[in-house]
Each structure stands twice: as C-alpha cells, then as structure tokens.
C-alpha cells in the first residue's frame, strides 16, 4: 500500500503534496545560434574609407609590341584608360532594447550574449555577400572600351537531371577544370594555383565525395589531401576547396545590402565557384563591426546597437568563375 499521501514533502505544495514548487538553479549555460567566424574577411581586399563613401579604381587597356626596321618611323600607340567606382550607401545594423525593470530580475547578462549573436550574424552576411558578388561577376561582360585587357566572367552550366551521384560528380569536376583552363589561358595560372579558391555548397561537396579519381589515393601524392573516410576534399584540379553553407540556395528578393545583392532562382543554382581573393572583389568599408550600448532614459532602458557599413563590388569579373547546376536543389545524393 502506498503511503505517498502521508509524506511531508519539501518543495511540493497542495493539499495532496502533488504540486512541484522547486526553485530553478541557473547553471550559467545559454544555448543560442552556433558560433561563426567569417571565412572570407581574412582573404578579401578590404579598403577602409575616410572622408568619403566612394572608392575609385583606375583601369588601363592593353598594349601591343611592334617591330621596326632601319629608317622606319616609330608608331605611337594610345593606352585607353577608364575608372570604376564603388559607393557605400547602406548600413547593416541590429538594435535591441532592454528594459531596466527586466534587467533587475534576470540572473545573467543577456546583453553580452546578444552582442555575440550580432557579430556572428554580420559575419554570415559578409560571407554571403562575397559569394553573391562572385557568382554575379561570373556572368558579367568585359568593360566595352577595355576588351583588349579585360575579359568576361566565366559562367558554365550543367544539367544534373537524371544523373547519378557519380555521374554528377564527374561532370562537375570536368566543368571546374574547364574554368581553370580558361583562367590559365588568361595568364592567371600562377595565381590560380597559389591563391585561387573554390567555395562550394555542402550539397556539391557531398557529390564530389562520390568521384572515383578524386578520392583514389593512387591519383594523389604521399600524404593525400582528399580522403573519403574523413569526408575531406581539400584540392580540386589544383585549387583549394572551401565547403561553406553561405551560398544563397534560394532566391533573395530583398537583401539588406540592396538590390545588387538580390539573387534570382537561376543564380541560386550557382553553388560552386572559383575566384582569386586578391583580384576578383574589393570591399569598401566605412565602418567596421561596432557595438554601442547606450541608455535611453526616456524609455527607461538600455539600447544595444551593432552595425557595419560596407559595400562589395566585382573589381575583376574576368577572375571569377561559377558553375550553374540545374536541379541541384532537388538532387538525390543517394541515387
């Protein structure tokens, strides 16, 4: 026979001692969005602006050597020049308000946790913005007056419909090699292999793990860089690989940085790229990541503002490549 109803039970209220009134013990653990540090900021060409919101780059056309025999007049040749501007006109920001009255009754400093979340969100937005500009640069034409010195971006397209994972992986690797060859034909061979970067979405990365030669140690040097068991693809056609979830995998109609960062449905299928960090993009920055905590006495609260002001533009579209993978979003990796 149970004698539960006869017990005197601390922290249990009610006539039948069946209402749990235990106090909570806060362990100092706060679960929030996973931490993230920008992967592209250390690689990008970032220029801080002072006293202006416009950065200017000069562009020169190409030159051509000529031959001369004795007695012939030397020909003069004009070098065409142009300029390219990038304007910073948009501020990315986050604002949070904390009522004094609520702060008096809380057991941890939420402002610190929120500030960390803000910094991580801005890092994600920066990396996404970089990739958006790379995939857009791949579809850009060369400057009209400078076509002898500049080339268009390199945009290739693949239809993965009906393919197996191995077939898709093989086609992606071959198409990536075509982009590499194009860059080498543009006298970018040294730069491609020394600083070139191939970012790709996790879905594309998973497909490449199914590639026979890419994962076969017989096709790699001692101390293999690609390893199926460790789910590692470090090099593709001689170029460093970066697996990143920052690709826009669906259309973006209202990007906070403005319409130049909106992504169409077609552009969202460009989930593998190749670019040269020192040449492809330039970032004009008016204000690096900053946080300000200030007191709003009228509203009896603290306000936390976190912000960053910059713009990213395609400096040299002819050093940007992307592969548009039709059907990548619905591709069955197990097929």
UniProtKB/Swiss-Prot annotation:
What keywords are assigned to this protein? Capsid protein, Late protein, Virion
| GO CC terms of this entry | viral capsid
Highest taxon in the source lineage? Viruses
Q: What is its main location?
A: virion
Q: Where in the cell is it found?
A: Virion
What's its job?
A: Assembles to form a prolate capsid about 56 nm in length and 41 nm in width.
What name goes with this protein? Major capsid protein
The source organism is Pseudomonas phage phiKMV
Q: Provide the taxonomic classification.
A: Viruses, Duplodnaviria, Heunggongvirae, Uroviricota, Caudoviricetes
């Amino acid at each position: 026979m149970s004698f539960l109803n006869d017990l005197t039970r601390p922290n249990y209220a009610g006539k039948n001692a069946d209402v749990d009134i235990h106090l909570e013990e806060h362990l100092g653990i706060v679960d929030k969005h996973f931490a993230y540090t920008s992967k592209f900021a250390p690689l990008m060409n970032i220029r801080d602006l002072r006293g202006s919101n416009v950065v200017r780059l000069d562009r020169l056309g190409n030159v051509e050597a000529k031959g001369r025999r004795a007695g012939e007049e030397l020909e003069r040749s004009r070098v065409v020049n142009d300029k390219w501007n990038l304007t910073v006109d948009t501020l990315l920001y986050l604002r949070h308000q904390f009522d004094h009255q609520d702060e008096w009754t809380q057991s941890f400093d939420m402002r610190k946790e929120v500030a960390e979340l803000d910094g991580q969100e801005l890092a994600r937005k920066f990396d996404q913005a970089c990739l958006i500009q790379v995939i857009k640069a791949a579809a850009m034409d060369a400057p009209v007056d400078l076509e002898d010195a500049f080339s268009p971006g390199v945009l290739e397209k693949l239809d993965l419909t009906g393919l197996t994972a191995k077939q898709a992986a093989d086609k992606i690797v071959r198409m990536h090699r075509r982009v590499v060859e194009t860059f080498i034909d543009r006298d970018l061979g040294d730069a491609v292999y020394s600083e070139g970067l191939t970012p790709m979405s996790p879905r594309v990365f998973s497909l490449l793990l199914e590639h026979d030669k890419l994962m076969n140690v017989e096709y790699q040097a001692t101390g293999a860089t690609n390893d199926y068991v460790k789910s590692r693809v470090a090099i593709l056609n001689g170029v460093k690989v970066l697996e990143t979830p920052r690709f826009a995998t669906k259309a973006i109609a209202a990007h906070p940085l403005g319409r130049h960062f909106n992504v169409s449905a077609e552009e969202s299928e460009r989930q593998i790229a190749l670019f040269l960090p020192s040449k492809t993009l330039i970032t004009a920055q008016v204000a690096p990541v900053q946080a300000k905590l200030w007191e709003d006495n009228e509203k009896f609260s603290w306000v936390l503002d976190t912000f960053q002001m910059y713009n990213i533009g395609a400096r040299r579209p002819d050093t940007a490549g992307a592969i548009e993978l039709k059907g990548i979003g619905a591709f069955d990796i197990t097929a």
